[in-house]
């Protein structure tokens, strides 16, 4: 029986690396995978692949707010059997797309593995994360650590001087140096 999985964490926990490793494991056994990543991440660089911080890459389809995932996946699956769907940056999915993914699991019987952030720099849920927390069959937290050694489960956005940014757009692109993964204790200490 196929399931919808949501692998979530703070930044720098290796989500993309885990996604690419999972895809490789399927492919190594002669199974076909289909990878997606968010258009919002790709717009600036015009890329159509997933790249981990340690250098692993794979081509990927792009989704945006209008993408009908169930329809796209159904068409591709009819052409040639897909054994697993893997979605990077799944926190950018919307409610309808998460429901589409439940249909991929329940109707097409294809497992779907989603990887993304749970919350933003203000500790607010992303839309995709909210709906995946509600609809996923399995919730798996990937671990990363705070500078104090505790498990990091929050993200702080910082400016060039290392000061915490408390307001602004939920989505801001730049390098990983603009974000720091911290535990809840240090989130409260630094954010408030």
UniProtKB/Swiss-Prot annotation:
Q: Where does Zn(2+) bind?
A: 146, 148, 183, 186
**An annotated GO cellular component:** cytosol
GO biological process, any:
DNA biosynthetic process
Per its UniProt record, what SUPFAM superfamilies does this chain match? Glucocorticoid receptor-like (DNA-binding domain), P-loop containing nucleoside triphosphate hydrolases
Pfam hit, one: TK
Keyword Nucleotide-binding attached = yes
Keywords (alphabetical) are: ATP-binding, Cytoplasm, DNA synthesis, Kinase, Metal-binding, Nucleotide-binding, Transferase, Zinc
The cross-references to NCBIfam families, in alphabetical order and at most eight, read: PRK04296.1-5
| Catalysis performed (reactions) | thymidine + ATP = dTMP + ADP + H(+)
Q: Which HAMAP family match?
A: Thymidine_kinase (MF_00124)
Catalytic site: 89 (proton acceptor)
Subunit description: Homotetramer.
What domain of life? Bacteria
Gene name per UniProt: tdk
Q: What is its EC number?
A: 2.7.1.21
Q: Which InterPro entries match?
A: P-loop_NTPase, Thymidine_kinase
Q: What is this protein called?
A: Thymidine kinase
- Signal sequence interval, chain numbering: none
Q: Which organism is it from?
A: Blochmanniella floridana
Q: Which family does it belong to?
A: Belongs to the thymidine kinase family.
Localization: Cytoplasm
């Amino acid at each position: 029986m196929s399931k919808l999985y949501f692998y979530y964490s703070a930044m720098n926990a290796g989500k993309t690396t885990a996604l690419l490793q999972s895809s490789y494991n399927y492919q190594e056994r002669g199974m076909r995978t289909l990878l997606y990543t968010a258009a919002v991440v790709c717009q600036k660089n015009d890329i159509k692949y997933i790249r981990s911080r340690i250098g692993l890459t794979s081509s990927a389809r792009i989704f945006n707010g209008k993408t009908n995932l169930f329809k796209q996946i159904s068409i591709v699956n009819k052409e040639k059997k897909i054994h697993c769907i893997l979605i990077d940056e799944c926190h950018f999915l919307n409610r309808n797309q998460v429901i589409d993914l439940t249909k991929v699991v329940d109707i097409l019987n294809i497992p779907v593995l989603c990887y993304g952030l749970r919350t933003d720099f203000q500790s607010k849920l992303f839309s995709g994360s909210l709906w995946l927390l509600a609809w996923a069959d399995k919730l798996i937290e990937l671990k990363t650590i705070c500078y104090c050694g505790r498990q990091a489960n929050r993200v702080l956005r910082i400016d060039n001087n290392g000061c915490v940014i408390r307001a602004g757009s939920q989505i801001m692109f730049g390098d990983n140096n603009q974000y720091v993964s911290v535990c809840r204790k240090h989130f409260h200490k630094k954010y408030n």
